[in-house]
C-alpha cells in the first residue's frame, strides 16, 4: 500500500513538472458568523424579456430586472450586446449596477472620420421619450450606491443636420456614492445632472452633449469627475454645431465643496467650464489637467468661493466668434481663482478679462497668442479686483497687461516678454511691477 501511495505521489509531481496538470486555488468569500458567504448576483435583462433588436420597447423588461436586483439587496443587471429601445424611463435602485459590455468608454467617429458607423455594436440604449421637453423626467435615475456602467446611450430621433430638439437629462444622480463609469453619451441634449449627489464618481465618460454636459450643485461632500471627453463625434453639421457653439456649456459648477476634477476635455462650446452662484452657494475645488478647445470662452467665472478654484496644468484654446477669450472673470466674482502651469493659445482677442472684487492669479503660465486683429489689446486685461502674474511667458510681441482704474492691487513679477515690456497701468491702487525680462 505504501508503495502505491509513493508511486501515486511521484506521478502527480511528474505531471505538475511537465505542465500536464493544472491546479487552481479558489478562495471563497469571507464568511460572517451566522450568515452565508456574500455573493455577487447578476440579472440578465434578456431573462426578463428584453429583445435587444432596436424595435421592441424593452423598458419594462429592464425595470423588472432592476427591481429584482433591488429587492434582493443589490446586484448587477447585465445587458448583453444589442440595441435596446427604451421608450420610457429607468430607475436604478440602491446598491444595483446597470452594466453593459464596455469595459472602457467607446468613442464613435465624427471629427476626423465621418464615414464610420454610428452605434450598432456593444451595448446600445436607444432613447426616444421626452422629445421637446427639457424639464421632463430623466432617462436614467441613480440613487445611493447605484451605478451605470459600460453602455452607449443614443437618441436616434435627434437630427444631426438641424438645431437640436430638447430632451430631459440623460442621467440624474441623487443621493450618496452613485457612479457613472465607462459610458458613452453620444448625443444627449443634457448629459449628467449631479445635484444633491454627494461623493459621486463620474469617470471615463465620452460623448457630445449638445446643450450641457455635466451640472454639479448642492454637493457638500467631495464629488469626483475624471477622464471625461466631450467631442463632436456625432455631428459637426453647420446648423447643429453653430447652435452648440452659441448655446452649449460643457461643465457647470454651482455649490460644491472640495470638488476634484481630473483629466477632462471639451471641444466646441459657448463655454467650456462655468462657475456660477446658485441659491445653494458657490464652488471651490481642485481642477487638474483640464482642457477646452474651440470654445468661445474656455473658462467663465461668475462667482467662486474665497478659498478658491485651483486650476493646474490646464490647456485652453479659443478662436471663434466675435470676442474669443480663454478666461472671463465676471464683475460679480468675489472669490479666488488660481491658474498654475497652464497654457493658452489660438488666434484669440485676449487671454483673460478680469472684473469683480476677487483675486485672480497666474503662475508659471504660457501665453502664446492674442490680439489677433492687431487692435492693441493686452493679453491680460484687469478691470478691477486684485491680480498676481508671476513667472509667466508672453510669447507674442504685443501688449502684455493692462490695469484699469478700479484695480485695487496688482503684482507683476518675474515674467518674460517677447519684445519690449508693455504694461499699461491706470490703476489708482497698489501696484508692484519688477524683475521682468524683455527681449
Where are the model-predicted features located?
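Bacterial signal peptide processing site
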Residues: 21-22
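Feature marks extracellular polysaccharide-active and adherence modules
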Residues: 80, 87, 93, 99-101, ...
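Extracellular beta-strand/beta-solenoid scaffold signature
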Residues: 120-140, 161-172, 186-193, 208-220, ...
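Bacterial N-terminal signal peptides that target proteins for export
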Residues: 1-8
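Surface-exposed or flexible loop/turn and strand-edge residues in extracellular/cell-surface modules
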Residues: 40, 74, 81, 87, ...
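Leucine-rich solenoid repeat scaffolds
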Residues: 401-439
Amino acid at each position: 500500500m505504501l508503495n502505491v501511495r509513493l508511486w501515486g505521489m511521484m506521478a502527480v509531481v511528474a505531471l505538475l513538472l511537465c505542465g500536464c496538470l493544472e491546479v487552481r486555488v479558489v478562495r471563497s468569500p469571507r464568511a460572517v458568523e451566522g450568515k452565508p458567504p456574500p455573493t455577487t448576483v447578476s440579472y440578465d435583462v434578456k431573462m426578463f424579456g428584453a429583445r435587444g433588436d432596436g424595435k421592441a420597447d424593452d423598458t419594462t423588461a429592464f425595470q423588472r430586472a432592476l427591481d429584482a436586483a433591488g429587492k434582493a439587496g443589490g446586484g448587477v443587471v447585465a445587458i448583453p450586446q444589442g440595441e435596446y429601445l427604451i421608450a420610457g424611463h429607468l430607475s436604478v435602485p440602491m446598491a444595483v449596477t446597470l452594466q453593459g459590455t464596455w469595459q472602457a468608454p467607446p468613442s464613435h467617429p465624427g471629427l476626423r472620420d465621418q464615414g464610420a458607423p454610428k452605434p450598432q455594436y456593444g451595448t446600445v440604449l436607444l432613447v426616444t421619450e421626452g422629445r421637446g421637453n427639457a424639464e421632463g423626467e430623466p432617462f436614467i435615475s441613480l440613487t445611493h450606491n447605484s451605478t451605470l456602467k459600460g453602455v452607449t446611450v443614443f437618441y436616434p430621433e435627434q437630427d444631426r443636420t438641424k438645431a437640436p430638439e430638447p430632451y430631459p437629462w440623460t442621467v440624474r444622480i441623487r443621493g450618496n456614492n452613485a457612479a457613472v463609469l465607462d459610458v458613452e453619451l453620444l448625443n444627449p441634449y443634457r448629459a449628467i445632472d449631479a445635484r444633491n449627489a454627494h461623493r459621486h464618481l463620474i469617470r471615463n465618460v465620452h460623448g457630445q452633449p449638445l446643450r450641457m454636459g455635466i451640472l454639479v450643485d448642492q454637493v457638500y461632500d467631495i464629488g469626483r469627475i475624471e477622464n471625461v471627453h466631450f467631442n463632436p463625434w456625432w455631428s459637426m453639421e453647420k446648423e447643429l454645431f453653430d447652435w452648440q457653439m452659441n448655446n452649449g456649456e460643457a461643465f457647470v459648477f454651482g455649490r460644491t465643496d472640495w470638488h476634484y476634477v481630473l483629466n477632462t476635455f471639451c471641444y466646441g462650446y459657448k463655454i467650456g467650464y462655468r462657475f456660477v452662484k446658485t441659491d445653494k452657494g458657490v464652488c471651490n475645488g481642485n481642477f487638474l489637467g483640464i482642457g477646452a478647445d474651440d470654445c468661445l470662452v474656455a473658462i467663465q467665472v461668475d462667482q467662486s468661493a474665497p478659498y478658491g478654484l485651483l486650476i493646474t496644468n490646464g490647456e485652453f484654446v479659443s478662436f471663434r466668434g466675435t470676442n474669443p477669450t480663454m478666461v472671463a472673470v465676471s464683475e460679480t466674482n468675489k472669490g479666488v481663482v488660481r491658474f498654475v502651469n497652464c497654457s493658452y493659445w489660438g488666434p484669440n482677442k485676449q487671454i483673460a478679462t478680469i472684473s469683480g472684487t476677487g483675486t485672480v492669479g497666474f503662475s508659471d503660465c504660457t501665453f502664446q497668442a492674442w490680439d489677433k486683429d492687431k487692435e492693441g489689446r493686452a493679453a491680460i486685461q484687469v478691470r478691477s479686483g486684485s491680480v498676481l502674474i508671476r513667472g509667466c511667458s508672453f510669447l507674442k510681441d504685443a501688449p502684455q497687461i493692462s490695469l484699469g482704474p478700479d484695480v485695487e492691487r496688482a503684482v507683476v513679477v518675474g515674467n518674460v516678454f517677447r519684445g519690449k515690456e508693455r504694461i499699461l497701468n491706470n490703476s489708482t491702487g497698489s501696484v508692484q511691477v519688477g524683475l521682468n525680462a524683455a527681449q
